[in-house]
Amino acid sequence: MTRADTIGTPHTRARRRHYHDEMNATPATFVQHHDANEAGRDFVVGDLHGCVDALRYLLRQIAFDPTCDRLFSVGDLVDRGEHSEQALALLAKPWFYAVLGNHEDALCAVADGRLRRQWWYGIGGAWAADVPDERLRYYAEHLRTLPLVRVIGSGKTRFNVLHAEFFGSDADLDAGNYSAETRQQLLWGRELALGHGDPLRQRGLSLTYCGHTPVRDITQIGSQVFIDTGAFGPDGTLTIVQPQALRRWSISVEAARAEGAAELALP
């Protein structure tokens, strides 16, 4: 995803444009700040990808209190798993705070007519084959309100949430006037997780939770913590972390269903 497709000969080679180059589905807000949660606890969940049953189980396991706790999401609520529309319904929950992921960005591109449905189906969007255009546009309208970055708290307890990766400091992140290259990096970047990025390029960055690149276990590289443990895959799990307490919980969809998660109500 991160390597540019090219066309032509070595002498005339040009970069093939991707739908996300122009970012017509630019979020209404690039970065959103949240005060520290003095009344309850904050959690961050990895790429959900429609695996809502695993989320139901984990919320019960952590005794999530919707009156005072908050759940932040690194994005990619939809595609690949079985319950993408249930995952989108989480956006209406007052305790749920997601950032835009590349799969939500693809949904918006399809709704805008910038991307063919067949391309999206190829990366997991086939659940929407029978979803009318009108409903898809409704989802896109709500997804466009999601920021690319969420900043929680300040000082030593501050942490950031974004989808893929970021190179820069807290000050760079807070500025919010991201270039097209930075926006693509926030949604699609994999340099750091795959070992191709320089960890020193994140000096001055607070603890930052990311998803996008599936990892077998939570992986920290410098300030960035990758928590997409592949919930949709046969050997994957959904992971929730509690930043301040440095705690984590994980479960597979299969194991969650064996525990009756499908019958659990979301808060």
Tell where the protein language model's regions lie, with residue ranges.
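Conserved beta-sheet core of the metallophosphoesterase superfamily
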Residues: 185-254
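Divalent metal-coordination and catalytic microenvironments
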Residues: 47, 76, 101-102, 128, ...
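Short glycine- and acidic-rich boundary segments immediately preceding or forming the N-terminal edge
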Residues: 2-49, 53
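Active-site environment of divalent metal-dependent phosphoester hydrolases
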Residues: 49-53, 79-82, 104-108, 167-169, ...
